[in-house]
Amino acid sequence: MFATPLRQPAAANHQTPKNSAGMDEHGKPYQYEITDHGYGKDAVKVLHVSRNGPVHAIQEFEVGTHLKLYSKKDYYQGNNSDIVATDSQKNTVYLLAKKHGIESPEKFALLLARHFINKYSHVEEAHVHVEAYPWQRVCQEETRTNVNGKCENGVQGNCDFSSIDNRSLHNHAFIFTPTALHYCDVVIRRTDPKQTVITGIKGLRVLKTTQSSFVNFVNDEFRSLPDQYDRIFSTVVDCSWEYSDTENLDFLRAWQTVKNIIIRNFAGDPQVGVSSPSVQHTLYLSERQVLDVLPQVSVISMTMPNKHYFNFDTKPFQKIAPGDNNEVFIPVDKPHGTIYAQLARKNINSHL
């Protein structure tokens, strides 16, 4: 299944249609019923190249398509007459990419989900998951050649590789920059006029060396951690949000906006930073600002594991390294604290 499943069976809302239970080969009903089902194709990898003259653009996706059929006869009787083969679903990904192009994970997922619902009347629900590979255009200054401290013959432009001009972008060369993963989930149900569009950020790893504290927490017989007035704060952010309105929405710009908001609330001003009294507070400020800035977002969920960096104790080694140590730390990724919260506008029903 998908890394981020959207829907879980809800027993309270589940209504079993009459005669939905399976029949055996003698026409007698089984004593069990299928309460959830579906099938699909996962890990379909596609690269789309947009060739606009000499300037090319690329999108590389990993796509999963899952369908839920009205009928369960493929399970109960082994009757495959309603099955849209997973190989056909794979082909659909490539053919729609060829026919319509690829602009963003969300738009492509919506295109695929609508296709399955519109083309196959026996499909009850279509769920599409897309993960975007983080390619960025190479800066021209990164392609200059330097030999023995001098520019190679025939190479024009600045050969100072310590300074990269981000405005000079290469026409057709790209570099893989896995800072964070952009993914989305789209669910369209034939009986529900509202489509579900969820976008997410996965694996955004950040660290700051000061302006983080953790003090005045519960002090009892189980506590061993002292108050920390200045510590290293590092986390790997996973975040997802649901759109209530996608009309004329620039999905790529919205995703970048959320990412920038998270980084800004974590890091603060480049010169002075921002104080983080707890991971919880930083997380909440990020979520609140997303809802303030993007009215199309109805609910946002975020997880921030606390990746610890502990001071190496130099006290037993004063002859070798005298004085206090605030420069050498031991990274400890396990065990780690995990902080999460979901922030929603009032009176919102979410699929997060």
From Swiss-Prot:
Tissue: Malpighian tubules.
Active site residues according to the UniProt entry: 41, 86, 308
Main location: other
Stated regulation of activity: Repressed by 20-hydroxyecdysone.
Keyword Oxidoreductase set for record: yes
Family statement drawn from the similarity comment of this UniProt entry: Belongs to the uricase family.
Protein name, per record: Uricase
Organism: Drosophila melanogaster (Fruit fly)
Source species taxonomy: Eukaryota, Metazoa, Ecdysozoa, Arthropoda, Hexapoda
Gene transcribed to yield this protein: Uro
